[in-house]
Amino acid sequence: MYYTSYRSQVFGVARIFASFNDTFVHVTDLSGKETIARVTGGMKVKADRDESSPYAAMLAAQDVAAKCKEVGITAVHIKLRATGGTKTKTPGPGGQSALRALARSGLRIGRIEDVTPVPSDSTRRKGGRRGRRL
């Protein structure tokens, strides 16, 4: 197809965005311009509270992997992202299980990279002078 191949592997880029409210599994070509498949945890489960769960992320990743194989992608580089910025830099609960599901589905894993946006110096974080009081 139109993807560069490396040692007879056809690569795509799996961008996993794992927040504490949802998990996105989005596969593009190497340039990032062409979307091949994008599935979220919320598309796979009915209850709102389960959108970010590892189970929903696993189902989303399996769907994406099936679509990739259909198109002819055999390997993916993974870019894992948390919310970042002034919010949490820790990936949500679905990140790890989405990555594992992609690996177990038969897709080869190239490079794994954390692309969470980290501010060099940012605007003030929400919560006020005395912070969030529980």
Curated annotation (Swiss-Prot):
GO molecular function: structural constituent of ribosome
Listed Basic residues bias regions: 125-134
PROSITE patterns attached to this UniProt entry: RIBOSOMAL_S11
Cited Pfam families: Ribosomal_S11
SUPFAM superfamilies assigned: Translational machinery components
Entry GO terms, CC: ribonucleoprotein complex; ribosome
InterPro entries: Ribosomal_uS11, Ribosomal_uS11_CS, Ribosomal_uS11_sf
GO biological process: translation
Region (Disordered): 114-134
Keyword Metal-binding applies: no
Keyword set, alphabetical order: Ribonucleoprotein, Ribosomal protein
Cited HAMAP family: Ribosomal_uS11
Family label: Belongs to the universal ribosomal protein uS11 family.
Record's protein name: Small ribosomal subunit protein uS11
